[in-house]
A protein has these predicted regions:
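Conserved S-adenosyl-L-methionine
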Residues: 65-174, 182-184, 188-191, 195-196, ...
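Long recognition/docking surfaces used for binding and targeting
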Residues: 1-59
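S-adenosyl-L-methionine
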Residues: 45-70, 77, 81
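A conserved structural/catalytic subdomain of Rossmann-like adenosyl-cofactor enzymes
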Residues: 166-169, 174-380
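Short, functionally important structural connectors and interaction interfaces within domains
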Residues: 61-62, 124, 232
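Conserved aromatic-histidine-acidic binding/catalytic patches
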Residues: 16, 20, 39-40, 64-67, ...
Length: 380
C-alpha cells in the first residue's frame, strides 16, 4: 500500500480545515468508519472511487491532465444493461481505474444467482481488470476485496503492451472500458488515442464477445488519418452495433468532455448492409446541481427504460432521438452525423427563419453584392 504514502505528506490533508473543524484526513477516516464500512460489501456505488476523487482534489490535482476520468455509477450500471451481463459472463476491464465497472458487473451477476457457491465462483473467476496507475490499482484491489472477492483477478500493467492473442486465450465474453482521454499529443503518442484503445480491447476478446466503451465523441469522428485507418480496421474484424450520445454535464461532471457509449460485437466483421443505432441520450433524467454535482431526478428511471427499449428494438422512436443507418469508416459514428431534421417548422420558427434570410439578403443588396443571390453565377 506504499502508493498511499502521499497521504502522510500532504499539508492539505493533514492541516485543520476551518469548515470541517478537523483535518480532512480525520474527517474522511471517521466518515468511512461510521458510514461506509457497514454497507460497503453490498452497495452498488464505487465509494472508494469517490473518495479517491476527493483525495486527489486535496492533494493538488484532479487527474485530468493524465486523462483520468472516473466513471459515474449510473453509467456503469447502464453498461450492464446494454451488454446484458449474465452470471456466465467473463468480464474484462483493461483500464480498470478504481474498479467501478467491475463493481457494477459483480453486483449484476451475484444478484442473479442464489447460492453462496455461485456467488463465490463469480467473484473469484468472472471479473478481471488491468490498471496501469499503481494508486488506482490499489483502490480497485481494495474495492474488490472489501466486497468479498477472495481471488482478485487484477493486474497492475500497461494494457497496450499486452498481446491481444494472449488475452484472447482467457475467453472474455464481455469488455467494458473507459480509456484515458486525450493522451495523444503528437505523432509519437498517436498509439494512445482512444480509438486505438478500443481496437486493442476488441482484438483481445473472445469471438462474439460484447464490448462497451465510453469515449469522447471525437473518438467516433476520426480526428486524423491514423484514427480513420483504425476505424477501418475495426469494421474489417468487428461489428459496430450502435453509439449513444450522452450529456457531458451529467456523465463527466466538470471534465469538459462530451462522451458517448459505443457498443460492439468482437470478431464478427461488420456487415455492409447492417443498420446501426445512433441515439441522442442527452436528456437522461439527471441534472447538474450547484455544490452537489450530478443528481438523479424522478425522470431518470423512465428515460433509461425508454433508451433500453429502443436499443432492444422493442420501441420505435423519432429520428431526433434515434437513427438507424448503414455506416462507412469515414463517417462520424454519431447521431448528429446521421440525423436529418425533417420536421415541419411551426409558424413562429418559419417567421424567424424568413426574417433572418431577408435580413441577410437585404445586407447583400446594400453592399452591392446582390449578384451572389442569382443562380448560375460563378464567384471569381
Amino acid at each position: 500500500m506504499h502508493q498511499f504514502n502521499f497521504i502522510k505528506d500532504r499539508p492539505n490533508l493533514n492541516e485543520v480545515d476551518d469548515n470541517l473543524g478537523k483535518t480532512p484526513l480525520k474527517y474522511f477516516t471517521e466518515y468511512i468508519k461510521d458510514k461506509i464500512f457497514p454497507a460497503i460489501s453490498t452497495t452498488h456505488e464505487d465509494i472508494l472511487g469517490f473518495f479517491y476523487g476527493e483525495f486527489i482534489k486535496y492533494s493538488g490535482g484532479d487527474g485530468q491532465s493524465l486523462g483520468i476520468v472516473l466513471t459515474p455509477t449510473h453509467i456503469t450500471e447502464l453498461f450492464c444493461d446494454l451488454l446484458e451481463i449474465t452470471p456466465q459472463d467473463k468480464v474484462l476491464d483493461p483500464c480498470a481505474g478504481t474498479g467501478s465497472f467491475l463493481v457494477s458487473a459483480m453486483n449484476r451477476m451475484i444478484n442473479s444467482v442464489e447460492t453462496k457457491e455461485e456467488k463465490r465462483y463469480i467473484k473469484e473467476n468472472n471479473l478481471h481488470g488491468i490498471e496501469l496507475k499503481e494508486n488506482m490499482f490499489s483502490i480497485a484491489t481494495t474495492n474488490m476485496i472489501l466486497r468479498g472477492d477472495g481471488k482478485t483477478n487484477l493486474v497492475c500493467a500497461d494494457f497496450l503492451k499486452q498481446n491481444p492473442q494472449e488475452l484472447r486465450k482467457d475467453k472474455y465474453t464481455v469488455g467494458m472500458m473507459n480509456p484515458p482521454y486525450s493522451l495523444r499529443k503528437n505523432q509519437e503518442t498517436a498509439y494512445l488515442s482512444e480509438i486505438h484503445f478500443v481496437k486493442h480491447l476488441l482484438d483481445s476478446l473472445d469471438d462474439n464477445a460484447r464490448c462497451g466503451v465510453i469515449v469522447p465523441q471525437s473518438a467516433m469522428v476520426g480526428k486524423n488519418k491514423e484514427d480513420k485507418n483504425i476505424k477501418k480496421e475495426i469494421l474489417k474484424n468487428h461489428t459496430l452495433e450502435g453509439v449513444i450520445s450522452l450529456n457531458g454535464d451529467t456523465s463527466f461532471y466538470r471534465v469538459g468532455t462530451i462522451p458517448c457509449i459505443a457498443i460492439f460485437t468482437a470478431h464478427r466483421p461488420h456487415p455492409q448492409e447492417k443498420r446501426c443505432k445512433f441515439i441522442n441520450f442527452e436528456d437522461d433524467g439527471y441534472k447538474l446541481s450547484k455544490h452537489v454535482g450530478i443528481v438523479k431526478t424522478e425522470r431518470a428511471i423512465e428515460r433509461k427504460e425508454h433508451l433500453l427499449r429502443c436499443w432492444r428494438d422493442q420501441l420505435d422512436a423519432p429520428s431526433k432521438y434515434m437513427v438507424k443507418s448503414t455506416i462507412k469508416p469515414t463517417d462520424e459514428w454519431l447521431h448528429s452525423f446521421y440525423y436529418f431534421n425533417d420536421e415541419l417548422p411551426n409558424k413562429e420558427e418559419f417567421i424567424i427563419t424568413m426574417s433572418n434570410y431577408l435580413t441577410f439578403e437585404f445586407d447583400l443588396v446594400m453592399q452591392n453584392k446582390e449578384y451572389l443571390l442569382k443562380d448560375g453565377n460563378n464567384y471569381d
